[in-house]
Amino acid sequence: MTAVRVLVEGLDHPEGVTVAADGTLYAGGEAGQIYRVDPSTGTVDQIATTGGFLLGLCADGDGRLYCCDVARREVMRFDPNGGALLVYSTGSPDRAFVNPNWPAFDDNGNLYVTDSGGWKEDNGCIMRVDATGTTTVWSEASTAFPNGCALSADGLSLYVLESTAPALIRIPIGEPDRRDVIASLSGVPDGVALDTDGRAYVFYYRPDRIDRVDPDGAIETLAEDPEGTLLSAPTNGVWLEPDRTRLVVGSLGRWHLTECDFGATGIRLRYPTIP
């Protein structure tokens, strides 16, 4: 695995990673820690804690972080500049979060959040929190433990990994009841990132593997670690700014972040302005 190396160490089983608009790298921990990471120096600073268990993270245009806390069953918002930590969403009025897993913004400030539901209970859904903070059930097309998600480059589709199907699917933003299967997978897929060629990078909880899926569904394994030391439950990844040619991958099974260079360029995340 010559394209894969340990980037930084000293984190508590980090599942989620994200990059803010200014290029700052953040990660979460299994005791609710929010970490700020400097890839150039290897410095890891814990800047806050929710007291729960963090899964996915993303950032808005002002650099505030939106963190899925599975223990609290809430999406929390944290301002790294002012230190304010608050509850952003507990789910919709008629359906509370069961397992809020991964958040992704669109350009209009809508936050799509996968609610995985129970393991193998086929009761997951995707919620949407609009820019005013109102939460609704957006789609029930994906029920098989919807996990990581990513908005397409054109903003017209949401890519979702279903851990228990297992499959990579796509839901058109304008047709939330539609579920298009891009590829049937094996193992337990967890997170997804997209590149500028329309390919999806799939990160697995089990086995310790990273695949690349072409738009036509062809699957290529890019890295696998039978020992589970360099890649250890590599659950999610994010492209490092500014060039977005390096993927930073979480290691839920250990205490480090991994850097991967697969000869590709990632798409830029959305950073909308939220009141």
Summary of predicted features, one role per range:
Residues 29, 70, 163, 204-205, ...:
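Structural signature of WD-repeat beta-propellers
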Residues 33-35, 74-76, 124-127, 167-169, ...:
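A short loop-to-beta-strand structural motif that recurs across blades of beta-propeller domains
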Residues 38-42, 79-83, 129-133, 172-176, ...:
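Short loop/turn segments that connect beta-strands within beta-propeller blades
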Residues 3-8, 42-48, 84-94, 134-140, ...:
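A short beta-strand motif characteristic of beta-propeller blades
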Residues 206-275:
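C-terminal closing repeat unit and adjoining cap/tail of repeat-based domains
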Residues 9-22, 31, 50-69, 92-116, ...:
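Beta-rich, blade/repeat-based domains predominating
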Residues 64, 70-76, 80-82:
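A basic- and aromatic-enriched beta-loop-alpha substructure that forms the phosphate/nucleotide-
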Residues 26-45:
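Beta-propeller domains
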